[in-house]
From Swiss-Prot:
Residues 23-36 have a biased composition (Basic residues). InterPro entries: FANCD2. Keywords: Cell cycle, Disease variant, DNA damage, DNA repair, Fanconi anemia, Isopeptide bond, Nucleus, Phosphoprotein, Ubl conjugation. This is Fanconi anemia group D2 protein. PANTHER family: FANCONI ANEMIA GROUP D2 PROTEIN.
């Protein structure tokens, strides 16, 4: 009971006072006592003094304690016997009490009687308690004296109401009250209760608190109910006593209903209660809840606990950090500390409640889970989730799930989490290990928003917690990094990067943990290695102290070891680490406000360290072209992203970049001579050079020298004594040169602009007729030459894409045309050069690992696929080819260039084959910078051709043509997919190279998604221009060809390119607006800007338009394009684009109608035909669009009935190659897609219909009955289609979804029929009769599957038959329930095939008879089963689910 009252402030003070009095009154020594006894003994002849002396107590005067010469029990017994045996008993009692009253008139004497007595016995002889009771307490233990003593005390108490504490700081009223506590027996409890309540009513407030909180120790259990009622009345009258009264009520044995009333009274006052009173009140509320009302109480408590009770005032928040660091505070700091103490105490109360009451913790989680609005979520909610997660291990999974759902839905955002940590860090730091455990769990997710939340938990734990917790955070992050999981490693490194910036001094203390990651470099990617070395270098060179010097030494050791390795993978680690470290060492600190000019500038010693490190890297990599190219790329990245000190930049310009001209640039007038396999020519020059000043890139001779060096074996560079320069380094070296010049000259590239228009020493690249006569080595040489030329041009475009003069723009556009032309030429070579491996374009581990698989693995896949296809063609199958689903073309598994034959079989159209082969080679092309897409702004560009004297000789108009536009859009689309698509949507297959999806995006990966989105938003206007131009192109094309866009007069190649541009633009728009980052508040402005661009295409509006208006206008703008959509795939992207935009709107009903209407238009449109043998519409795309239509249409059942009842009969009555006139997309080839989607959506729809109850209104019953009639009618129409379309995939769909529909009928419809039968007898019987025919057909389908012995169909038969049998039983039960068994006839069925012919097989007859024997019929198509049977069936159905799905994929 005492433990429950820890929160009572008054009691704590009392105990402290008592302890103080005990200490003060302890005897100093026995010698001292004896010396003062003679002078201090009370000399009084009163009966009171005499009887006490006889019984063993000697009263003392002054400051001395009364002395107890005997044991306490012996004294009470002796005095009791003396009083009882006294001749004048019971009058002696009055005399004794009168003597006591006279004695205690003196204040010192009264005080001595209230304080404990001094023991005169030896401690060894004492068998009683170590603490002696006071005289008054001893007298209260004697029954015959107790009533009179209590009366005396209550009469004496008012004298001290308004007196301050005496000189000894002793509170007399509190001492008086304490005498009544823990009495062995209360003689008259009712009288005592009355006296106490009367005293409370007149006592001052501080004494009221003391008396009320002492009640449980004073009163017996029998008085609890009366006291409780009195206190509840007092609670209403005097709100200032709320805390002590509730504290006491929690400790009394009271009726639950009474406590409920009190609790409701308190809940109503909750919003007006002071913070310091809140812990006691919350304790009472939580202790008074029952299992039935817990959720209701907790939900109300959540709402009424305003933030002001749990969050410090704003003026206190600002000083918290100061409090943490200084450790001392002023008077205001004491107030802050008090407020924090109250909050900590509050959460201690809640922790205690949820630890011992499972219902409270579960109700609290449920209350938070039920909160839907973002604004309703509070800091208090997050703290509670953390507390329950750390306190109750059984609810961890539940909380984890709730938290993930809240994060996904955007209800819990970063700002809320930050507020939680900044305000309640003292509460949360005790749960550090649990919070880190939760963060670790969240980082294992595939959802980026959940991963980000987990990383924020680590970040804020490090920021707000103490040193020990910071160490735990770093240790946990290091564990993630060493795990090898790519997403975890990326996230953990990003957090470390933030922590290094956030609190470098704290991170320095934990640097030894980060340094340990150097032992696990094998498992992390190049981009992750960059981050790791950036963290370590920042720690090593931020401050010059002993710890940082140790890190420097270790890093130097690791880097030298890796650089000296002969394995390229380890050399790569050394190069990346060294360049990253050099960047930190040579960083430009001139703008740092904390450094003086002398310290900011790089010293000569530091500059020497940087240059020696870079020279070491250069010397260790120069023997390997790949290593050199990687070094140049890494150095270029460093210059691009980091601001280097001018001294370091100057050294780069003088040492490395000046070597470029010697290595790759020659005079254009001097044609190289040598034994080259092809004649060397200067090609692709943009200027005519008449003088000797012209330059050219010496590409073909360098490539030939490299190939010759390979073939010549050891006798390569040793004989010539010259350093071989690999053409592989051309593009990386130029990138380094360009960025260095750009940084030194503030973006001016005049020094190197000659490289933009200079020619290249090549040979005639157009193969013509000589292609077939070339040797394999010559074709490989030509392929490599074109790859290197393309990479050179791509870097040239990267360099000069942002030039503003028309001449330079024209030249860049010309180079872009050259890239497109060369890709077409390259395609011709690749098609006849099997197993060719291109030269690397990106130099990292991921690329090297995947290179061997690029050709051989895919070639093997094609060969295997070809064998399978040939086998399928030779197999005699009854499945009609028109109903067989074609698989979606998968870009991950595209065949290699070497297999031209297979390509021609699988794909039609030159563009498809070209894009396919180039896609395989994507990893070997240099990456285009995001700035390149500024070219999309170009319309018509006038280029001036100058003569030798710089006079205008002619003008040429250059424009961005469709091929160049498509080239740029494809690259931009791939970049957006890589950066903005959530990882869960692009999950790589099991055991696939983990970095394969990032190949060719290493520069892009160094930017954040926000940066990419911002860059693309700058392109929205030009992309809208291109979209409108393409729209106009197709509109004009349709008008010229009388509405037929693929008529005979159409230029096929141009048409396909424009169509592809259309698709890519829609794809880019979709990827942009589908970005999950828009849900974060900091990105809302980006969304507004993008929508404003779209809406302004229709009309110029104000920038401050509301979101709904912007969404509506944007959708209206995009909807206008639907008439010119050239392909079904474009249509699907347009629909998806509109959907992601409308998701951000609140007008859901109108939005669904818009989507459904547009989807129906696309389904009812005649699309341009592809291959004559089959539709050009992908089955997956058709499936997606049809699902969108049915999910968004107002009535799914009517839509299904229209397709199945109108479209399909039109198809049946049309010629073989024709289609439905209402739905032209419905052909015999696509029928199975329509059938599967309609069956799946029908089953999904009926599962959502609530069964209803007998208590529902008549109108509701009729509406549901009508709905089920429509559903069964649709099901009947669909089922009967298998008589016409009996291909294997159709039958499979019918078996799978037929069973699911029957299950839904049993669960959702049969309860409705139970209580609708009597009122709507005819309707119910009609419904059952229709459904009986359908289930009869399902029974025939089971027989058909068995007789054909197709295992992929027969695996569905047992579960379907069981479901049908349950239906029979359930219909019988329904008829019995309504006393009308004769209303519906149930009988046995014969086994028949789909045409209704009886199956004569004896085995099937016997098995059917056996199966039908126990049930009334084998299946006569009825309703469904008992509830027990349902559960068994469901579990069986779940086991079967996976095999169904895997088979569907193969259909």
């Amino acid at each position: 009971m005492v433990s429950k009252r820890r929160l009572s402030k008054s009691e704590d003070k009392e105990s402290l006072t008592e302890d103080a009095s005990k200490t003060r009154k302890q005897p100093l020594s026995k010698k001292t006592k004896k010396s003062h006894i003679a002078n201090e003994v009370e000399e009084n002849d009163s009966i009171f003094v005499k009887l006490l002396k006889i019984s063993g107590i000697i009263l003392k005067t002054g400051e001395s304690q009364n002395q107890l010469a005997v044991d306490q029990i012996a004294f009470q017994k002796k005095l009791f016997q003396t009083l009882r045996r006294h001749p004048s008993y019971p009058k002696i009692i009055e005399e004794f009490v009168s003597g006591l009253e006279s004695y205690i008139e003196d204040e010192d004497s009264f005080r001595n009687c209230l304080l404990s007595c001094e023991r005169l016995q030896d401690e060894e002889a004492s068998m009683g308690a170590s603490y002696s009771k006071s005289l008054i307490k001893l007298l209260l233990g004697i029954d015959i004296l107790q009533p009179a003593i209590i009366k005396t005390l209550f009469e004496k108490l008012p004298e001290y109401f308004f007196e301050n504490k005496n000189s000894d700081e002793i509170n007399i009223p509190r001492l008086i009250v304490s005498q009544l506590k823990w009495l062995d027996r209360v003689v008259d409890g009712k009288d005592l209760t009355t006296k106490i309540m009367q005293l409370i009513s007149i006592a001052p407030e501080n004494l009221q608190h003391d008396i009320i909180t002492s009640l449980p120790e004073i009163l017996g259990d029998s008085q609890h109910a009366d006291v409780g009622k009195e206190l509840s009345d007092l609670l209403i009258e005097n709100t200032s006593l709320t805390v002590p009264i509730l504290d006491v009520l929690s400790s009394l044995r009271l009726d639950p209903n009474f406590l409920l009333k009190v609790r409701q009274l308190v809940m109503d006052k909750l919003s007006s209660i002071r913070l310091e009173d809140l812990p006691v009140i919350i304790k009472f509320i939580l202790h008074s809840v029952t299992a039935m009302d817990t959720l209701e109480v907790i939900s109300e408590l959540r709402e009424k606990l305003d933030l002001q009770h749990c969050v410090l005032p704003s003026r206190l928040q600002a000083s918290q950090v100061k409090l943490k660091s200084k450790g001392r505070a002023s008077s205001s700091g004491n107030q802050e500390s008090s407020g924090q103490s109250c909050i900590i105490l509050l959460f201690d109360v809640i922790k205690s409640a949820i630890r011992y009451e499972k219902t409270i913790s579960e109700a609290w989680i449920k209350a938070i889970e039920n909160t839907a609005s973002v604004s309703e979520h509070k800091v208090f909610d997050l703290v509670m989730l953390f507390i329950i997660y750390s306190t109750n291990t059984q609810t961890k999974k539940y909380i984890d799930r709730v938290l993930r759902n809240k994060i996904r839905s955007g209800c819990i955002q970063e700002q809320l989490l930050q507020s939680t940590f900044s305000v309640h860090y003292l509460v949360l730091k005790d749960m550090c290990s649990s919070i880190l455990s939760l963060a670790q769990s969240l980082l294992h997710s595939l959802d980026q928003s959940i991963i980000s939340f987990g990383s924020l938990l680590y970040k804020y734990a490090f920021k707000f917690f103490d040193t020990y917790c910071q160490q735990e955070v770093v240790g946990a992050l290091v564990t993630h990094i060493c795990s090898g999981n790519e997403a975890e490693v990326d996230t953990a490194l990003d957090v470390l990067l933030e922590l290094v910036v956030l609190n470098p001094s704290a991170m320095m203390m934990n640097a030894v943990f980060v340094k340990g990651i150097l032992d696990y470099l094998d498992n992390i990617s190049p981009q992750q290695i960059r981050k790791l070395f950036y963290v370590l270098s920042t720690l090593a060179f931020s401050k010059q102290n002993e710890a940082s010097s140790h890190i420097q030494d270790d890093m130097h050791l690791v880097i030298r070891k890796q650089l000296s390795s002969t394995v390229f993978k380890y050399k790569l680690i050394g190069i990346i680490g060294a360049v990253t470290m050099a960047g930190i060492m040579a960083a430009d600190r001139s703008e740092s406000p904390s450094l003086t000019q002398e310290r900011a500038n790089l010293s000569d010693e530091q500059c020497t360290q940087v240059t020696s490190l870079l020279q070491l890297v250069h010397s260790c990599s120069e023997q390997s072209p790949q290593a050199s190219a990687l070094y140049y790329d890494e150095f270029a990245n460093l210059i691009q992203h980091e601001k280097l000190d001018p001294k370091a930049l100057e050294w780069v310009g003088h040492t490395i970049c000046n070597d470029f001209q010697d290595a790759f640039v020659v005079d254009s007038c001097v044609v190289p001579e040598g034994d080259f396999p092809f004649p060397v020519k200067a090609l692709y020059g943009l200027e005519e050079y008449d003088t000797q000043d012209g330059i050219a890139i010496n590409l073909l001779p360098l490539l030939f020298s490299q190939d010759f060096a390979k073939d010549g074996g050891p006798v390569t560079s040793q004989e010539s004594g010259q350093k071989l320069v690999s053409p592989l380094c051309l593009a990386p070296y130029f990138r380094l040169l360009r960025l260095c010049v750009e940084r030194q000259h503030n973006g001016n590239l005049e020094e190197i602009d000659g490289l933009l228009d200079c020619p290249i020493f090549l040979t005639d690249l157009e193969p013509g007729e000589k292609l077939e006569s070339m040797s394999a080595k010559e074709r490989s040489f030509m392929c490599s030459l074109i790859f290197l030329t393309l990479n050179w041009f791509r870097e040239i475009v990267n360099a000069f894409c942002q030039e503003t003069s028309p001449e330079m723009k024209g030249k860049v556009l010309t180079r872009l045309k050259h890239i497109v032309e060369l890709q077409i030429i390259l395609e011709k070579y690749l098609a006849v050069t099997p197993d060719y491996v291109p030269p690397l374009g990106n130099f990292d581990v991921e690329t090297l690992d995947i290179t061997p698989h690029t050709v051989t693995a895919i070639s093997a896949k094609i060969r295997k696929k070809g064998k399978i296809e040939r086998k399928q063609k030779t197999d005699g199958s009854k499945t009609s080819s028109s109903d067989t689903l074609s698989e979606e073309k998968n870009s991950e598994c595209d065949p290699t260039p070497s297999h031209r034959g297979q390509l021609n079989k699988e794909f039609t159209g030159k563009e498809e084959k070209t894009s396919l082969l180039l896609h395989n080679s994507h990893a070997f092309f240099r990456e285009l910078d995001i700035e390149v897409f500024s070219i999309l702004h170009c319309g018509l560009v006038t280029k001036f051709i100058l003569d030798t004297e710089m006079h205008t000789e002619a003008t040429e108009v250059v424009q961005l043509g469709p091929p160049e536009l498509l080239f740029l859009l494809e690259d931009l689309s791939q970049k957006l997919e890589s950066m903005l698509t959530p990882p869960i949507a692009r999950r790589v297959p099991f055991l696939k190279n983990k970095g394969s999806r990032n190949i060719g995006f290493s520069h892009l990966q160094q930017r954040s998604a926000q940066e990419i989105v911002h860059c693309v938003f700058q392109l929205l206007t030009p992309m809208c221009n291109h979209l409108e131009n393409i729209h106009n192109y197709f509109q004009c094309l349709a008008a010229e060809n009388h509405g037929v866009v693929d008529g005979p007069g159409v230029k096929v190649q141009e048409y396909h390119i424009m169509s592809s541009c259309y698709q890519r633009l829609l794809q880019i728009f979709h990827g942009l607006f589908a970005w999950s980052g828009f849900s974060q508040p900091e990105n809302q402005n980006l969304l507004y800007s993008a929508l404003h661009v779209l809406s302004s295409r229709l009309k110029q509006g104000e920038h401050s338009q509301p979101l709904e208006e912007l969404l509506s206008q944007s959708v209206h703008y995009l909807q206008n394009f639907h008439q010119s959509i050239p392909s079904f795939q474009c249509a699907l992207y347009l629909i998806r684009l509109l959907m992601v935009i409308l998701e951000k709107s609140t007008a859901s009903a109108q939005n669904k109608e818009k989507i459904a209407s547009l989807a129906r238009q696309f389904l009812c449109r005649v699309w341009p035909s592809g291959d004559k043998e089959k539709s050009n519409i992908s089955n997956d795309q058709l499936h997606a669009l049809l699902c969108i239509y049915l999910e968004h249409t107002e009535s799914i059942l009517k839509a299904i009935e229209e397709i199945a009842g109108v479209g399909v009969p039109e198809l049946i009555n049309s010629p073989k190659d024709a289609s439905s006139s209402t739905f032209p997309t419905l052909t015999r080839h696509t029928f199975v897609v329509f059938f599967r989607v309609m069956m799946a959506e029908l089953e999904k729809t009926v599962k959502k219909i609530e069964p209803g109850t007998a208590a529902d209104s008549q109108q509701i019953h009729e509406e549901k009955l009508l709905y089920w009639n429509m559903a069964v009618r649709d099901f009947s129409i669909l089922i009967n289609l298998i008589k016409v379309f009996d291909s294997h995939p159709v039958l499979h769909v019918c078996l799978k979804y037929g069973r699911l529909f029957v299950e839904a009928f049993l669960k959702q419809c049969m309860p409705l029929l139970d209580f609708s039968f009597r009122k709507h007898r005819e309707d119910v019987l009609s419904l059952l009769e229709t459904f009986q025919l359908d289930t009869r057909l399902l029974h025939h389908l089971c027989g058909h599957s068995k007789i054909h012995q197709d295992t992929r169909l027969t695996q569905h038969v047992p579960l379907l038959k069981k479901t049908l049998e349950l239906l029979v039983c359930r219909v019988k039960a329904m008829l019995t329930l309504n006393n009308c068994r004769e209303a519906f006839w149930l009988g046995n069925l014969k086994n028949r095939d789909l045409q209704g012919e009886e199956i004569k097989s004896q085995n099937s007859q016997e098995s059917t008879a056996d199966e039908s024997e126990d049930d009334m019929s084998s299946q006569a198509s009825k309703s469904k089963a008992t509830e027990d049977g349902e559960e068994d069936e469901v579990s069986a159905g779940e086991k079967e689910q996976d095999s169904d799905e895997s088979y569907d994929d193969s259909d």
